[in-house]
């Protein structure tokens, strides 16, 4: 006797039965054949239900251990220096977001609205790091997207649904996991519309992208090609519901402070009785940004519907010299700690003098790169030393001071010899 893959007997008169429930081939729709066993479609469905219930139980147990806002803030403090107001805002918003997901599963009568987040702050102030740290803490899939590469569907560039595809890739195409992930969209200020007045021409990388992002951010079912394939009509798509995905949008919004100041200044105050803006107020960009209102974002170039989808706004302050010095030394993964670890692997101690840290911070401020530029400065100063060090012997310590940062001298190498330690500058004869 022989059977095909659906369990149909090729010999007449022979009835086949499911090896699990015992039902015959006439009582079920499908009977799938394995090596000497059969399973019916009903048993397959039952197995799927059992697996699905176990996955839901795991997800619920993971959510029951959701850290409280105070605990989220404590973790953020370990990695991000300063920006206390922004960190508190994020901690509360993220906690409420995942509580909202829990509420939806309980089918409560009151439906909680989704609260996506907008981060406003200068380059290098910690926007991306905050989003990354949150995702790592909550153990959820996380992906980043650059708004400047996005275009409307049908135009050259990335489709907005590619963002969801990247999120799926981060969790090995597990749709359930992806539907509770975090998406960070950077440079969101770069897709502001080119003028306040509606244009008769298409703005495919500005207002057009904002329109395309609206439904995705609010909550829709996105069709994503499996395993990163290209879309074509005959293809089956993965359906990803974005209503529980937390979207965090970030941007520098250069010039937004001027928009806020223009609003807060009395328009009618002209002539001798006019209020004069002080130079001090002009310099306090961080404090000005903290007063941002939805109307300011609309004036800047975001469409009203898009601003409405980002109800939580957190502003970050520009980092000053003391804050940059703390960033160099205090976080768990501080830059100086990372380089010290690299030198430890060569059995060499690395020391940064206090004046060196100040010089690094001043240089980063001068370049207007914020915390992002700190690593570049340290890397350039230690490059030659890291190149030569593995080939040198008896080096016990490397010292970096202000003169090294200013490129007036090389890092100081301290040699350990059996007789006595000898100190000299690298490259000295």
Swiss-Prot record:
ATP binds at residues 122-129. Zn(2+) binds at residues 18, 21, 40, 43. SMART domains: AAA, ClpB_D2-small, zf-C4_ClpX. InterPro entries: AAA+_ATPase, ATP-dep_Clp_protease_ClpX, ATPase_AAA_core, Clp_ATPase_C, Clp_protease_ATP-bd_su_ClpX, ClpX_bact, P-loop_NTPase, Znf_CppX_C4. Keywords: ATP-binding, Chaperone, Metal-binding, Nucleotide-binding, Zinc. It comes from the Bacteria. Residues 6-59 form the ClpX-type ZB domain. GO terms for molecular function: ATP binding; ATP hydrolysis activity; ATP-dependent protein folding chaperone; protein dimerization activity; unfolded protein binding; zinc ion binding. HAMAP family: ClpX (MF_00175). Component of the ClpX-ClpP complex. Forms a hexameric ring that, in the presence of ATP, binds to fourteen ClpP subunits assembled into a disk-like structure with a central cavity, resembling the structure of eukaryotic proteasomes. This is ATP-dependent Clp protease ATP-binding subunit ClpX. The gene is clpX.
């Amino acid at each position: 006797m022989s059977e095909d893959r659906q369990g149909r007997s090729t010999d007449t008169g022979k009835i086949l039965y499911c090896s699990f429930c015992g039902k015959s081939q006439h009582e079920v729709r499908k009977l799938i054949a394995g090596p000497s066993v059969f399973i019916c479609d009903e048993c397959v469905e039952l197995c799927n239900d059992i697996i699905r219930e176990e996955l839901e139980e795991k997800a619920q147990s993971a959510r029951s251990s959701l850290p409280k806002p105070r605990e989220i803030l404590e973790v953020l403090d370990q990695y991000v220096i300063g920006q206390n107001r922004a960190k508190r805002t994020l901690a509360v918003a993220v906690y409420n977001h995942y509580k909202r997901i829990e509420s939806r599963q309980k089918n409560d009568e009151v439906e909680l609205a989704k609260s996506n987040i907008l981060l406003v702050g200068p380059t290098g102030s910690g926007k991306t790091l905050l989003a990354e740290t949150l995702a790592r803490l909550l153990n959820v899939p996380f992906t980043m997207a650059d708004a400047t590469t996005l275009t409307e569907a049908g135009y050259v560039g990335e489709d907005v649904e590619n963002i969801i595809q990247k999120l799926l890739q981060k969790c090995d195409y597990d749709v359930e996991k992806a539907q509770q992930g975090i998406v960070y969209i950077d440079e969101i200020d770069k897709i502001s519309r080119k003028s306040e007045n509606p244009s008769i021409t298409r703005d495919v990388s500005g207002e057009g992208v904002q329109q395309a992002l609206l439904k995705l951010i609010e909550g829709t079912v996105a069709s994503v090609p499996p395993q990163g394939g290209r879309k074509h009509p005959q293809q089956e798509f993965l359906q990803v519901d974005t209503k529980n995905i937390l979207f965090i949008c970030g941007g520098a919004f250069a010039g937004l402070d001027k928009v806020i100041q223009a609003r807060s200044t009395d328009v009618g105050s002209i002539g001798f009785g006019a209020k004069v803006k002080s130079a001090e107020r002009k310099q306090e960009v961080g404090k000005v940004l903290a007063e941002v209102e939805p109307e300011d974002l609309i004036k800047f170039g975001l469409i009203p519907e898009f601003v409405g989808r980002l109800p939580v706004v957190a502003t970050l302050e520009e980092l000053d010299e003391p804050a940059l010095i703390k960033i160099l030394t205090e976080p768990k993964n501080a830059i100086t700690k990372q380089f010290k670890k690299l030198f430890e692997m060569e059995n060499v101690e690395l020391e940064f003098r206090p004046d060196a840290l100040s010089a690094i911070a001043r240089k980063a401020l001068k370049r207007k790169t914020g915390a992002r530029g700190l690593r570049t400065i340290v890397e350039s100063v230690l490059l030659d030393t890291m190149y030569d060090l593995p080939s040198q012997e008896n080096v016990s310590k490397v010292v970096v001071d202000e003169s090294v940062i200013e490129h007036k001298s090389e890092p100081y190498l301290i040699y350990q010899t059996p007789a006595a330690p000898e100190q000299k500058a690298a490259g000295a004869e």
